Amino acid sequence: MPKYYEEKEEDKHPCAGVKEDLKSCLLQTDCVLQEGKSPKECLKEGYCKALQVTFFECKRSILDTRARFRGRKGY
């Protein structure tokens, strides 16, 4: 489920909810907090893999002409 913040402006871009959740997931991992690695390095190591796949599918559905009629995947 996406996390909503009252004081934050709503992003109108496609896949913004998934992107925000992926970013917050990466910033809360032990890889970033304790080991001091960058979120990019932690993403390559496999942290938050489900959200990464969901974000990829959402971005791909923007370009896929068949999926454009069915709607974007993700939230």
Swiss-Prot record:
It comes from Xenopus tropicalis (Western clawed frog). Pfam families: Pet191_N (PF10203). This is Cytochrome c oxidase assembly factor 5. Involved in an early step of the mitochondrial complex IV assembly process. Disulfide bonds join C31-C58, C42-C48. Belongs to the PET191 family. A motif (Cx10C motif) lies at residues 31-42. InterPro entries: Cyt_c_oxidase_assmbl_Pet191. A motif (Cx9C motif) lies at residues 48-58. Residues 28-66 form the CHCH domain. Keywords: Disulfide bond.
